[in-house]
From Swiss-Prot:
Protein family (similarity comment): Belongs to the chlamydial porin (CP) (TC 1.B.2) family.
Protein name: Major outer membrane porin
Organism: Chlamydia abortus (strain DSM 27085 / S26/3) (Chlamydophila abortus)
Pfam families: Chlam_OMP
Localization per record: Cell outer membrane
Keywords: Cell outer membrane, Cell shape, Disulfide bond, Ion transport, Membrane, Porin, Signal, Transmembrane, Transmembrane beta strand, Transport
One Gene Ontology term from the biological process aspect of the record: regulation of cell shape
Source organism superkingdom: Bacteria
Primary location class: membrane
Gene label: ompA
Gene Ontology CC terms: cell outer membrane; pore complex
GO terms for MF: porin activity; structural molecule activity
Amino acid sequence: MKKLLKSALLFAATGSALSLQALPVGNPAEPSLLIDGTMWEGASGDPCDPCSTWCDAISIRAGYYGDYVFDRVLKVDVNKTITGMGAVPTGTAAANYKTPTDRPNIAYGKHLQDAEWFTNAAFLALNIWDRFDIFCTLGASNGYFKASSAAFNLVGLIGVKGSSIAADQLPNVGITQGIVEFYTDTTFSWSVGARGALWECGCATLGAEFQYAQSNPKIEMLNVVSSPAQFVVHKPRGYKGTAFPLPLTAGTDQATDTKSATIKYHEWQVGLALSYRLNMLVPYISVNWSRATFDADAIRIAQPKLAAAVLNLTTWNPTLLGEATALDTSNKFADFLQIASIQINKMKSRKACGVAVGATLIDADKWSITGEARLINERAAHMNAQFRF
């Protein structure tokens, strides 16, 4: 049985390193691996010994924490219907779109194509009886997200009647054939957690852990690519809690009441892991249940444009004639997309359960290095290097 357990853990720890995939689970035996101190000699307190003191029971470890999520499985969290848009254009004649209607939300049920999240931090753990850890990380995180334009509600106004655009004209089309991607800045992040060895038998350890992480990065660069509208915005600002229509100044230098595009990241996780010590190497395998959310308060960001036309242009949006053979000069804004904007919808985990495999290398019971790969609910890699004081 022992040989079977050793073989299974070694195969999982080494074989899965080729296919990297929440938060790291960590080695369940980690609280009891470093039993000697770099600066002070280790002394484990026995809770059943009446002569033991808390000074014997407590120790501190510190080190580096790196977590790299290459593909988090996320979806957008929106309602089935969207309110405040104009009616769907029909026929060939230009028209006014001033009456709001409820329409199916093109973002509903959409998944993200790519979601990356990278964290580098300092690690600090308070150890009790060489069995339980209470730990925290303080560092910096940044991310990258990519999805179809439908997932972020790229909308605009086309086919509008008249020689000017009234302030009450509503967007009437949703652009689904496009891509939206954005990068966040690198900002402060933190996490707290606890880990403990629940059961030990010989060299095997069964443990559990809980973690919570948080960060509030701002969008650094937004890139929207579609046929009717294409634009890039550095450090975008937008409207929160503002119903359609957006102000006519939206996207210009004269825009007011805009706010920074800040994403609120929250994640919690619980995990259960099994490890087996093989001299200096301690492989482990675990399962975890996690929930992550990325919420930008549904901020709506308008396409950048000129406040006044130059060479008859306010944006680089193309003129769309379709079957027409000549421009409609009486409705001069009907043939290209106006007041285009996107909404950064709330994103959350699409799969909650995942698997992690890893191994810890120990040196002199004072130093350790851990590598971990995670699968199913994300593809991620984790590295942890620490020492005991």
